[in-house]
């Protein structure tokens, strides 16, 4: 058993039950599952492999909820970064975890921009553009945007279950 199989089972048993409610958005378990599979597929197409670290810095939005499933679905390890940390600490975490991808809410553009100046490795940035708030004052951080990136995935992607209980899915 893993959180991934719990999601799969919940989707099968309660497909039309509400799973996530956030501001003007809500998703059923079936929709959450499909979004997670598509995002995992998009990460796979990006080159994320088993054991790679994908960091996330976001508020409690549907995107971070989905990340907790979609990142392990591709065999990668999720590294959720505390939203209250300063740029120096975020930089250390990104460097030390050897993050390949960073999914980040644009509201953290100041912290992340400063943090990335001290990170030696190249990190692919995926911006979360929260459509339920005014983001006009938040600068774009990366080249990719979460919803567009998600839409590039395949909802029929054959995601990877952990090989055993020792395979890491989170830091």
Predicted feature locations:
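Hydrophobic/aromatic residues within well-ordered alpha-helical segments
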Residues: 10, 35-36, 119, 166
């Amino acid at each position: 058993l893993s959180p991934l199989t719990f999601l799969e089972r919940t989707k099968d048993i309660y497909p039309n039950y509400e799973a996530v409610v956030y501001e003007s958005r809500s998703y059923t378990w079936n929709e959450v599952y499909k979004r997670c599979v598509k995002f995992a597929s998009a990460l796979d197409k990006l080159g994320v492999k088993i054991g790679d670290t994908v960091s996330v810095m976001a508020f409690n939005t549907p995107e971070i909820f989905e990340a907790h499933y979609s990142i392990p679905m591709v065999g990668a390890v999720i590294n959720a970064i505390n939203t209250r940390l300063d740029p120096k600490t975020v930089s250390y975490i990104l460097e030390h975890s050897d993050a390949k991808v960073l999914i980040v809410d644009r509201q953290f553009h100041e912290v992340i921009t400063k943090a990335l100046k001290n990170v030696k490795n190249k990190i692919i940035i995926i911006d979360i553009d929260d459509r339920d708030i005014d983001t006009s004052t938040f600068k774009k951080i990366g080249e990719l945007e979460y919803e567009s990136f998600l839409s590039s995935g395949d909802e029929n992607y054959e995601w990877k279950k952990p090989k055993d209980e020792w395979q890491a899915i989170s830091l």
